[in-house]
Amino acid sequence: MSNARQRELIREFLAVTSATSAAAETYLERNHWSLDHALDDFYTQSGGGGRAEQYSAELVATFERYAAGGAMDTEALVRYVGDLGFQLEDVATLCLARLLKVEELTADISRFQFLSTWHGLGCSSLPDMRAAVDALELRLRTDAAYFRALYAYTFGLGLDAGGRRLSVETAIAYWSLFFLDHTYAVTVPAPRLRSWFEFLRAGDHSVSRDTWDMFPRFAQRFPDDTELLEHYNELASWPLVIDEYYEWVKGRNQL
């Protein structure tokens, strides 16, 4: 587990307890960095009868409808997403995953993750949660900063366990979600998107974090081939695969 993730768990522990940072780290370490187990340990040791947050019975019941052993596994998450009225491939589902701090698609959602998130938003039922996620999806249409945050988050979500690069087909699927319909605050011209997909599929490529992050900026800077061929600078700090794409476009235009 990364140091950044450990610090995040310590902050979450402190948010619902009166413990010191040192105590939070001790409880988390001896419970193998499981936040739920560490919190249960803390309240057992301190003699407290319950956690600082009092979650509504309706919210707890909503969680327990899907949870087994104190967590929602992948199968339960699929049912939950469906009951909210979304498909796994919807952008709204990405909004939901980021809201719940899901780090990878196969990771369980803990009781604390689920309850603290929805409690903080004042949501306890499926209709409440659906409305909150709908609002986030709507925000993508006008809030470029939120769009970029979700876009950046999605790269990590799409990685295979232990992987550092997206497969071409996974990256294309996500790019299609974000850019194909031109409905969100950040757009990519359709011809550039189609050409980019064709190039990636024609070669032996995978997609790095740098390429993922830079592609929207590149596509906006060079919206058509005329602009690209006249003004692209191979000495600029674009990822290597974008340099290769430029050469590919140049070669096609010389035929």
Swiss-Prot record:
Keywords: Ubl conjugation pathway. This is Defective in cullin neddylation protein 1. One of its GO terms (cellular component) is ubiquitin ligase complex. Residues 6-43 form the UBA-like domain. GO terms for molecular function: cullin family protein binding; protein-macromolecule adaptor activity; ubiquitin conjugating enzyme binding; ubiquitin-like protein binding. It comes from Eremothecium gossypii (strain ATCC 10895 / CBS 109.51 / FGSC 9923 / NRRL Y-1056). May contribute to neddylation of cullin components of SCF-type E3 ubiquitin ligase complexes. Neddylation of cullins play an essential role in the regulation of SCF-type complexes activity. Pfam families: Cullin_binding (PF03556), UBA_4 (PF14555). It comes from the Eukaryota. GO terms for biological process: protein neddylation. Signal peptide: none annotated. Residues 54-250 form the DCUN1 domain.
